[in-house]
């Protein structure tokens, strides 16, 4: 079992398999060149697999595959199948912008993937283009429908941006509710790679907008996980991921493996442990040591709620959010 210095059990790893992305979202990597490549830095998937086997043996119960955009990584379905075959009890999930999901959903499901989380920031094509610099809405919606068709569990993630998509909060809620999908609204997390004009809505503002139509009952916050779950009077549940709140980090149960082999204890802080050499060499003893050290290195909380703190400099496409 992996336990950090604040007695939090760490049983969840987010694994970035690439920094590449086919979107250039305002809140993530708007200025990154479209011909950006990271192939020379990437860990081979077979080596990532061996690392994750060790992590599973140490108590990891959930693995999320992220990017960049993970569906750009070749051989991903085979990688998932091998991971699933090693331990079928481990929950395998994937975060995606959904652009390539329609043609890959069935193979991902057959490989053993349990769930996809799809970014959906708007239901208006022009806004999706403005936010992501990609004419992507049709592809993303088709990917969502195909995922439901093949039997994948699904969640939607929406980053709420002031004066951009905040007037769609209820419309997006209805879209998700009608498909029996949970939507999670995400507070914008300030970072130096985002456009400077991007401003997000906080949890209270999001709730106030939803309360204009629905009576909201706050459900119990999960003992582990980042999302506060709210229940509407009709029983539908949605989530809010609010990193600016004081209790956001209390139940944190995760670490991150970047695509270049660095283990990141926290999304906010730049600190990381370079495990690339150990992973490439499949050095089990050293991997275990570095894994445990990264867990010990986890800070108590982020500093997004501290107005005097520095804006995080690590790119979210590096760690997968």
From Swiss-Prot:
Protein name in UniProt: GTP 3',8-cyclase
Gene3D superfamilies the record matches: Aldolase class I
Keyword terms of this UniProt record: 4Fe-4S, GTP-binding, Iron, Iron-sulfur, Lyase, Metal-binding, Molybdenum cofactor biosynthesis, Nucleotide-binding, S-adenosyl-L-methionine
InterPro entries per record: Aldolase_TIM, Elp3/MiaA/NifB-like_rSAM, MoaA, MoaA_NifB_PqqE_Fe-S-bd_CS, MoaA_twitch, MoCo_biosynth_MoaA/MoaC, rSAM
The keyword Nucleotide-binding is assigned to this record: yes
Family statement drawn from the similarity comment of this UniProt entry: Belongs to the radical SAM superfamily. MoaA family.
Family matches, as PROSITE patterns: MOAA_NIFB_PQQE (PS01305), RADICAL_SAM (PS51918)
Reactions catalysed, as given in the entry: GTP + AH2 + S-adenosyl-L-methionine = (8S)-3',8-cyclo-7,8-dihydroguanosine 5'-triphosphate + 5'-deoxyadenosine + L-methionine + A + H(+)
Annotated residues for binding of [4Fe-4S] cluster 1: 21, 25, 28
Annotated positions binding GTP: 14, 64, 95, 155, 254-256
């Amino acid at each position: 079992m992996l336990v950090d210095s604040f007695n939090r059990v760490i049983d969840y790893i987010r694994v970035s398999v690439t920094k590449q992305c086919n979107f250039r979202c305002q809140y993530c990597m708007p200025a990154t060149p479209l011909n950006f490549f990271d192939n020379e830095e990437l860990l081979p998937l077979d080596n990532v697999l061996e690392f994750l086997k060790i992590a599973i043996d140490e108590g990891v119960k959930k693995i999320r595959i992220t990017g960049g955009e993970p569906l750009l990584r070749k051989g991903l379905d085979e990688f998932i199948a091998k991971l699933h075959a090693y331990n079928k009890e481990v929950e395998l999930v994937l975060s995606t912008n959904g652009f390539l999901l329609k043609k890959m959903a069935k193979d991902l499901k057959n490989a053993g993937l349990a769930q996809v989380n799809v970014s959906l920031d708007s239901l208006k094509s022009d806004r999706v283009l403005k936010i992501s610099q990609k004419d992507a809405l049709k592809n993303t919606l088709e990917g969502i429908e195909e995922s439901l068709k093949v039997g994948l569990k699904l969640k939607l993630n929406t980053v709420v941006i002031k004066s951009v998509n905040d007037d769609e909060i209820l419309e997006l809620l209805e879209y998700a509710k009608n498909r029996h999908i949970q939507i999670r609204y995400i507070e914008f997390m300030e970072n130096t790679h985002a456009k400077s004009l991007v401003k997000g809505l906080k949890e209270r503002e999001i709730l106030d907008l939803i309360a204009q139509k629905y009576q909201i009952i706050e459900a119990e916050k999960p003992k582990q996980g980042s999302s506060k779950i709210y229940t509407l009077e009709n029983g539908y549940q949605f989530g809010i991921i609010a990193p600016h709140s004081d209790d956001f980090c209390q139940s944190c149960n995760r670490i991150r493996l970047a695509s270049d082999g660095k283990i990141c204890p926290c999304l906010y802080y730049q600190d990381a442990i370079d495990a690339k050499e150990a992973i490439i060499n499949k050095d089990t003893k050293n991997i275990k040591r570095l894994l445990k050290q990264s867990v010990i290195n986890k800070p108590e909380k982020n500093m997004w709620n501290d107005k005097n703190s520095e804006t995080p400099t690590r790119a979210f496409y590096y760690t997968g959010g």
